[in-house]
């Protein structure tokens, strides 16, 4: 299994959220903080299930959840993450869907996040061992994430 470009994962969540917003106007629009939290869960689940990272980018523990520098840099100036979805964004979404293992992970993470506000999502994340044991503004180690998420997956099974 190859490492996915993080942009493709972000775009999968962008397209998914845009569809949800069209179906229900009360749905919260995807935020930068939320997509980074979702990526944290994708990485953790991928490590737990496949023993490899889903993407190569570092995840930092921050006061308000997690940060992924490449995502923050690329999307910081974007007014709305679901505005202006072009064909390239749709193609990234479709590429994730074409990978059954990765698609299963993102769908599981999305199902977990559905109905949770960004505040609830970040509050949960900040009570989890990988975030709590990582000093602020430092990289959350993949090994720490793998150990934590493997235990979660065992509980679910």
Model-flagged regions — what are they?
Residues 1-157:
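Domain-edge interaction signal
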